[in-house]
Amino acid sequence: MVVDDSAVVRQVVAGLLADDPAIEVIAAVADPILAIARMKVQWPDVFVLDIEMPRMDGITFLKKIMAERPTPVVICSTLTEKGAQTSMAALSAGAVAIITKPKLGLKQFLVDASDDLISAVKAAARANVKRLQVVEKLTADAILPASDRHDAMLQTTERVVALGTSTGGTQALEVVLTALPRVTPGIVIVQHMPEKFTAEFANRLNGLCQITVREAKNNDRVVPGRALIAPGGKHMLLRRNGAQYSVEVLDGPLVNRHRPSVDVLFRSVARCAGANALGVIMTGMGDDGAAGLAEMRKAGARTLAQDEESCVVYGMPKEAVKRGGVERSVPLGAIAREIMAQMAG
């Protein structure tokens, strides 16, 4: 079901999806009130949902869906700062993917992005959204940030943790990062996410975690107690200068159809950290990160994968296991504990 107040978006999105023989569009409606009426007749397998709509906003509607009958939702949101904030709220409420749309040239953009849209809907149909319901864990930092949380951690470390994830990863990363203590090895993360969304995502996590979480900037140092998330639309590599790690943020072609790419990060970690690293590949569609994790393991790094049972989409971890890059597969709830155990000493 497509729910969007723009007649152009409804027409184009519904048409693109209907052209795929594996997808049936049961309805395309202008707002959530009309959607609710249609849902009484037939409940869809997947919703494609706008955020800003008349009579009921998309976030409120999403929460109603998840409370009544959890169903995969793909957000189709305008690429603005406000759109990024509301889309992050949607991911927190249980949406499984975001497709961004521009203010201008919308019809042509949707046609050009049809492959991404169709892939997102198909991946959403396979997602188990019941696993997306994560209880928000707040810390005192959400109300009053500790003034010394950065300064005490600015010594360097030879140990580094690299995390890679995609569909379902925003909720999975929240589970992992909020469970880590303040004294934690430096962390570098690739989460497949559009441009402008990663800063809002990092800011939200920073308010929930004992560690510092922020969107990476070029030449940021990787230090204990800090997690750096690759910016949407940019690749991120780990670099080493003597005893210090830092990140390089750069443009470049899509790798495995992604930018940032998990493979790019993992390969750089394998080359400059070797046995001092831990690689973790988590929920996500496709195979990005599978080759890079195998390179990390070959270089002496410890490697983990999120297990099938706890994944929203068991794609990236499955491919990493197939390619021999995974030492152990563990449940989502055990990953933080494994990070601390394997990086101790």
UniProtKB/Swiss-Prot annotation:
Source superkingdom: Bacteria
Residues of the CheB-type methylesterase domain: 154-345
Residues annotated as domain Response regulatory: 1-116
EC number(s) recorded for this UniProt protein: 3.1.1.61, 3.5.1.44
Reactions accelerated catalytically: [protein]-L-glutamate 5-O-methyl ester + H2O = L-glutamyl-[protein] + methanol + H(+); L-glutaminyl-[protein] + H2O = L-glutamyl-[protein] + NH4(+)
Catalytic residues as annotated in Swiss-Prot or TrEMBL: S166, H192, D288
Keyword terms: Chemotaxis, Cytoplasm, Hydrolase, Phosphoprotein
Broad enzyme group: hydrolase
Subcellular location: Cytoplasm
Modifications the protein undergoes after translation, according to the UniProt entry: Phosphorylated by CheA. Phosphorylation of the N-terminal regulatory domain activates the methylesterase activity.
Listed InterPro entries: CheB-like, CheB_C, CheY-like_superfamily, Sig_transdc_resp-reg_Me-estase, Sig_transdc_resp-reg_receiver
One GO process term, biological-process aspect: chemotaxis
GO cellular component: cytoplasm
Modified residues (4-aspartylphosphate): D50
Gene Ontology molecular functions: phosphorelay response regulator activity; protein-glutamate methylesterase activity; protein-glutamine glutaminase activity
Free-text function comment from the UniProt entry: Involved in chemotaxis. Part of a chemotaxis signal transduction system that modulates chemotaxis in response to various stimuli. Catalyzes the demethylation of specific methylglutamate residues introduced into the chemoreceptors (methyl-accepting chemotaxis proteins or MCP) by CheR. Also mediates the irreversible deamidation of specific glutamine residues to glutamic acid.
Domain notes: Contains a C-terminal catalytic domain, and an N-terminal region which modulates catalytic activity.
Family, as annotated: Belongs to the CheB family.
Protein name: Protein-glutamate methylesterase/protein-glutamine glutaminase 2
Source species: Albidiferax ferrireducens (strain ATCC BAA-621 / DSM 15236 / T118)
